[in-house]
């Protein structure tokens, strides 16, 4: 990010401004955009607001049963969903108050392990509207806390998501400009859903 020459340090990164992008382009179909490098935007740029309101499509998949959970979030990942929780725990980001409550339930449990039990429970709703669970474990409690399932009575739950087979194209970027140009056109918040394995 910086270089040293003749005892002086120089920035080796670009600071993006509004002039670098066409912000009048229409929204695109929801896609999963992947870019894992830092980038810099000029203070006060309209681009910052554009990024903040843009949407990130998130999928949590597991190896056990092929079921995946899909969520949408704002670019800053402030939405209270499972994908953001696991992301914040992995990256050691300060947890929001709600996420701290979730942490008290499941802690820093392995994502694959958690998904195995969560999706196995959710799979029961394919055939039943109401699923009995006399003694909810930490994974069922986490699903309930997020509102993905709701109490039907003291010993059973109802499904509060939807099953959907919608596919989202995944694009991987190695250039910050191209990523930002695509990200600011991601405007659709897709309702949280469960996708069944093939």
Language-model segment annotations:
Residues 2-198:
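Non-catalytic recognition/regulatory regions in large multidomain proteins
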């Amino acid at each position: 990010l910086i270089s040293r020459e003749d005892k002086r340090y120089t920035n080796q990164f670009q600071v993006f401004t509004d002039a670098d992008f066409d912000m009048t382009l229409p929204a695109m179909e929801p896609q999963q955009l992947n870019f894992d490098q830092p980038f810099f935007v000029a203070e006060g740029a309209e681009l910052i607001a554009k990024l903040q309101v843009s949407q990130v499509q998130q999928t949590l998949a597991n190896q056990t049963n092929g079921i995946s959970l899909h969520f949408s979030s704002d670019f800053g990942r402030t939405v209270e969903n499972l994908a953001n929780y696991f992301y914040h725990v992995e990256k050691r980001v300060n947890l929001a108050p709600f996420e701290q409550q979730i942490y008290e339930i499941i802690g820093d449990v392995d994502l694959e392990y958690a998904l195995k039990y969560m999706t196995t429970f959710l799979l029961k709703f394919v055939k039943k509207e109401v699923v009995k669970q006399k003694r909810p474990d930490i994974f069922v409690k986490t699903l309930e806390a997020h509102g993905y399932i709701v109490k039907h009575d003291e010993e059973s739950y109802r499904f509060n998501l939807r099953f959907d087979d919608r596919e989202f194209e995944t694009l991987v970027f190695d250039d910050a400009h191209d990523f930002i140009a695509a990200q600011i056109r991601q405007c659709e918040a897709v309702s949280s859903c469960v996708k069944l394995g093939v």
